[in-house]
Amino acid sequence: EAYSEYTDCSGSNLVNMITHEHDRELMKLFDLEECYDKLPPLRNAADICGHVTKEASEKTGLPEGIPVAAGMFDINACGIASGLSDEEQMCMVAGTWSINEYISKEPVTNGTVALNSLFCMPGYYLIEESSPTSAGNMEWFIRNLMSYEKAEAKENGGSVYDITNEWVASIEPQDNNIIFLPFLNGSNEDPLAKGTFVGLTAYHNKKHMLRAVYEGIVFSHVTHVNKLLRNRERPKSVRLSGGAANSDVWVQIFADALQLPIDVIEDKELGAQGAAMAAGIAAGIYKDYQDAMRRTVKITKTIQPRPEYADIYKEKYAA
């Protein structure tokens, strides 16, 4: 038997956010009304929806008969694995996409945010802002402009990321006036937006350009966070995961630009961890999401903002 799941379907505009059920009027808006009666029943993320069959066991190596939970929307999984347990907290995922989110007992209905969806914890909505403007831009820079450094690092048993962090740390923000617009993969704001370096001169080198990439990605997150803050108070801190969280110098830029403490999450694959938390609840390993977060979510460090850098980044962001 097939099932659908609340967080995923609500994030796909297939669930009425008030009734929490599939909605014929929504389907009609998408010219999919004839599909309404074919939609599978909705289940919660930690509901058991079946068990591993013999055929599936033979193909995957998983033991036959173990329970299979519904799972959840990937941004829900990242949120719960970041420890979003109440309305005060906010988290960011700096991977290919710039994902920025918090949970609320009420949806945001004024059109100022990109997405409302049902959160995996009953009684909460996930309020989210995102765009494809995060650390994927740095991967493009490394692939196209740092092939020599990447090969050299590999030959010496190191990592190209050690080099990128060293380059960025060697330049103070006030000493670099290049602005990078991180739209290599497009933008939610303007379909014609493209990635751009602004302010390049003969004085600048790859180190200056890379510093601009780090900062431009942070500024994209700042844009999304500012939109979220139209509808809530500033949090006491922000939890960060994704590739950028592996770089202390990058995390410091986040803290300085936002002027908020940044809590770095220990785990690296938060989407998988969030799904595993739902499976653990389904299997009776965890009592509920609060128990799962208490037992699995770890903060490795907190990077404090430096007030003396606030105006520098504010001026750069305004540019």
Predicted ranges, named:
Residues E1-M72, M138, L181-P182, G186, ...:
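Gly/Ser/Thr-rich active-site cleft segment
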Residues N16, R43-C49, A70, Y102-A319:
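Glycine/Thr-rich phosphate-binding loops that ligate phosphate moieties of nucleotide
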Residues L62-P63, S85-E87, R232-K236:
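Short helix-loop-beta connector
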Residues G65-A81, Q89-V93, I99-N100, F180-L181:
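Short glycine-aspartate micro-motif
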Residues G79-L84, A275:
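Hydrophobic residues within well-ordered alpha-helices
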Residues G83-E87, S104-E106:
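Glycine-rich loop at the start of a catalytic domain that most often binds anionic cofactors/ligands
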